Amino acid sequence: MHRYSYYKTAACTPNVSIGDPQANKEEILKCIQELDSDTQLVVFPELCITGYTCQDLFYEHTLLNKAKQVLFEIVEELPENLVAVLGLPLEIDNKLYNCAAICFNHDILGIQVKTYIPSYNEFYETRWFSSASELKENTTFTYKNKKVPVSNHIVFKDSTTSACLGIEICEDLWVTIPVSSTHALAGANILCNLSASNEIISKANYRRNLVKDQSAKCYAGYIYASAGPTESSSDLVFSGHNLICENGVVLNETKTDKIIYGQIDLDHLNHDRLHYKTSMQDLFHVNYTTVDFASKPIHEIEFTRYIDAYPFVPNNQDERIVRCLEILHIQAQGLATRLSKIHCKDVVIGISGGLDSTLALLVCHEAFKINNYDSKGIHAITMPGFGTTKRTKSNAQILMDLLHVSSEEISIVDGVNQHFKDIHHDPEVHNITYENSQARERTQILMDLSNAYNAIVVGTGDLSELALGWCTYNGDHMSMYAVNASVPKTLVRYIVESVALKDEILHDVLMDICDTPVSPELLPPDKNGKIAQKTEEVLGSYDLHDFFLYQMLRHHDEPKKIYDLACVAFKDVEKETIKKAIVTFYNRFFTQQFKRNCMPDGVKVGSICFSPRGDWRMPSDASRNLWTKQVEEI
């Protein structure tokens, strides 16, 4: 696969011999030899060249001199194009510092010094080490007659990949304002932590959350390498708990292997920094040294990163149910607030027996419970037409009865036929006029009934339909409050299913609705009375379209990258099918913006929303050529 912006990182915990840098050198080099050939960065634990648990041996010049010598030897034996971050003690200006050496292409780029030196409970580091705050200004370290910067305010910028590395050491992360936070403000998008974090009850969970959350706050990749069980067990146990996170997501975590890998997506991180500007506002104005280096380009990679085919839907069922019910509550709270603000106790909603209108009805029912309104104020209207099937009509009626709402059936057949006569349309011609006339007739009925009941019309269309423009302009496109507007189709099904799993009374009808093919039912049924017009046969799978939508709107990836990621996520789907779907997606996304620019109010529930008043602002006549050309070249 094309490299795109992926940066392959590794965290490694070698076996250590306490106080024996020569033996540790062999272990470190052994680990480096075992690395995948396309690894670009490897991070080792705190003080890995000597061992973290040397205690008063750190006073021994024999150990300190050997550690420095071993560092130089390792640097000379490093493979090309690999950044290695190694921990060791260094004596500088008659003080001992806990340091990380950043090494690349037989050179030392810089020395990062630990800032926060713990001296509490089991930690006693201030006995041996000084803080980076005690360094003299412009301190340097000599290597090959070259002055190497020594500081706690250095970032290392790779001009080839856009990776910018910031290093911190163990405790530097556990404080109120971590060192990595100022690194991020200085441009670091990959943060590395050399750690010696011991194990006590529940500390692993705390550590995991700490690393994960810091990667999220900094919009960064975070590589955490910790000392392992070969450290001294005189008083403590070290497990080698290594983590690689990206923007709040754990990409990899130590299980049994001493080396773990993570492919960091730099484009995604850089986009979020560009988009969420307040997070990158530097109010500290710390002076930083930037060390530039240039790696060799890597054009093709073995792609090992997990790509979720359903990015809107949690994989774990328990988590999914909790998330779905939370979304339902947010939707309902939005509607409840709107009704309360406008002093309205009635809503009108069209019910088809499909997923979207089912979810919207459930939202109305929940909103009425929040406001303590009578459910009879929900006026649920079924409007059978030329394409209505027995299954959907029956499910609609059962659901309305079980929810104890006011239900009414109004056929649109006579009204639409009269309309066909008025506009001189042949009802045997099943074209766009035939379909949209029905949608607009239904909307007219709902709007007029809302006047009659002093109510508002609740819209049922979802996020995926808005993305594709799969709605009739001024038909089902229009309402007075659109409760599903930021819920994608793949998630709608699971929200309805989650309610079914929690409600025995509604279970059977909701599960049958979930199993019903997605259709606007604007064309006549087949000869067996079943749905003939199936949306996904026309547009392509909503699974694919929601995937494209997420990658485009959340990460703003280019079409070619989205296509390649889709091929990874949907490996059982033919590539030609994916290509056909993505062509449809981009064509419709650009041509249908005019519908989104005048969409009704509706509450935002997730990270993606099309409200022209908030998240998505785009001219209706923008050119699609740049995007569709790239798609056509796939």
Regions found by a protein language model. Name each.
Residues 161-163, 218-220, 232, 253, ...:
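ATP/NTP-dependent adenylation/nucleotidyl-transfer catalytic domains that generate, transfer
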